[in-house]
Amino acid sequence: MHCKIAIDGPAGSGKTTVAKLIAQKLGIDYLDTGAMYRIVGLYLHSIGVEPKSTSIKDILEKVNIEYIGKDYYLNGKKVGDEIRTPEAGMFASQYAANPEVREFLTKIQKQICSNRSIVAEGRDIGTVVMPDATVKIFLVASPEVRARRRYEELKSKNMEVSYEELLRQIEERDKNDSNRDVAPLVKAPDAIEIDTSNLSIEEVVEKILDIVKERCRIK
């Protein structure tokens, strides 16, 4: 039996760190779908295409995104940390509201998640990409906590950032992600919500692992 784990939640809720650790501890594949939206958003912005442009579908037909090992490739070129900036996150949110972008990436994500045990994280994993997931988790935390986490993460990478600006961006992304017409950020009816505001990463991971071991019958 394949063990499929969906981890959804807003920006800065800890999805990426938690999902990576769970995949590592279980020895199964990991997919960061948010990275794909960052890749596409940054690319489309770089070539001057607006988020609501009617030409996006034609452009995406010539775009090739691959996930090999633990790395992403855009048109044959390995993608680096440029997709981890706050600006790339904003582009991801803006272009994700375009139905053509979501259709393009959802198709790729569904293919990656099929016929394997995997931990996939994003904003619509449990509702759209992997509705048949064995375990669905929805992580939440206050905007202030999420902004602080993102601030510390980016500072550790020697990026010049402002906490106030990150908080503003997170609140804007929450609004965009929750209110978009296509695949908005919503908790799946059968997802288990975990508030990570006052929990360490290790505590969140252990909580989820307990659920996974029971649902996936892992000893």
UniProtKB/Swiss-Prot annotation:
Family: Belongs to the cytidylate kinase family. Type 1 subfamily.
Reaction equations catalysed: CMP + ATP = CDP + ADP; dCMP + ATP = dCDP + ADP
Annotated binding of ATP, by residue: G9, P10, A11, G12, S13, G14, K15, T16, T17
Compartments where found: Cytoplasm
Entry keyword set: ATP-binding, Cytoplasm, Kinase, Nucleotide-binding, Transferase
The keyword Glycoprotein is annotated on this UniProt entry: no
Pfam family, one: Cytidylate_kin
Main localization of the protein described in the UniProt heading: cytoplasm
Record-level GO BP terms: nucleobase-containing small molecule interconversion; pyrimidine nucleotide metabolic process
Alphabetized GO MF terms: ATP binding; CMP kinase activity; dCMP kinase activity
EC number from the UniProt entry: 2.7.4.25
CC per GO annotation: cytosol
Protein name as it appears in the record: Cytidylate kinase
Organism in which the protein naturally occurs: Fervidobacterium nodosum (strain ATCC 35602 / DSM 5306 / Rt17-B1)
